[in-house]
Amino acid sequence: MKKEIIVYTISDSLGETSQKLLAAASAQYPDISFLNRYNFSFVTTEEELLEILKDALKDKALVVSTLVSKQLITAAKEFSERTGLLYLDLMAPFFELIQAKAGVDPIEEPGRRHQLDRAYFDKISAIEFAVKYDDGKNPQGFLDSDILLLGVSRTSKTPVSMYLANQGYRVSNLPLIPEVPLPPILEEMDPQKMIGLVCSPETLGQIRSSRLASLGLGNETSYTNVERIEQELAYAEEIFAKYGIPVIDVTAKSVEETAFLIKEKLDERN
């Protein structure tokens, strides 16, 4: 029968750090059952902390904490020294090392890492947005966009959308095809958020031919015909003029360069 150890984890935030450490450590003791039913998050007062520590002492538990408040850290340390409670403070020793090295005190703000993580989650949300509203899918999403890219096929709309999404911009894009009516919702779109992309007919023809070849298809189609491409570009220019949309020529430009120019255009208009 496995030996059982009761573990209390205490944090003034979510407590994920202590949970991860416990999971890593327990993996090294396959013959011990760690009972971690007591996970106390958002502990912010000394009174609440001491009640938890008293219960842990009664249960003869091992206590792991990730507190950042000096007041709470001191209270827990004094309690464990006075009572013999088996207590591990994960944060204070690291804080002391940093303070000794840099001479800077911690800000003692619980949950700070999760605030920083918001930027990451905002980026993920922007990427999901770009995927959802790529290539004119569900035009209703245009109104929620930070940027709407418009252009004929193969003018880098999708890769530029994804690049900008990785920087936190909510980007949708719309392919312009002469035979396909524009979505009515375009009339409601803020012109300040729209950017047109164009490319030289010759370069566009080469890009489209390469695309068809990669799919194992022949390239003798209207899709790669320079005259047809010129017609598409002329139509796109009409749309850009109608809505007052600034235009960026992506010929021989990298995705990064195009994205930089787009942000520059937006800054000029705002």
From Swiss-Prot:
Pfam families: Kinase-PPPase
Keywords, comma-separated and alphabetical: Kinase, Nucleotide-binding, Serine/threonine-protein kinase, Transferase
Reaction(s) catalysed (UniProt annotation): N(tele)-phospho-L-histidyl/L-threonyl-[pyruvate, phosphate dikinase] + ADP = N(tele)-phospho-L-histidyl/O-phospho-L-threonyl-[pyruvate, phosphate dikinase] + AMP + H(+); N(tele)-phospho-L-histidyl/O-phospho-L-threonyl-[pyruvate, phosphate dikinase] + phosphate + H(+) = N(tele)-phospho-L-histidyl/L-threonyl-[pyruvate, phosphate dikinase] + diphosphate
Domain of life, source organism: Bacteria
GO molecular function, a single term: phosphotransferase activity, phosphate group as acceptor
Alphabetized HAMAP family for the sequence: PDRP (MF_00921)
Family: Belongs to the pyruvate, phosphate/water dikinase regulatory protein family. PDRP subfamily.
Protein name: Putative pyruvate, phosphate dikinase regulatory protein 1
Organism expressing this protein natively: Enterococcus faecalis (strain ATCC 700802 / V583)
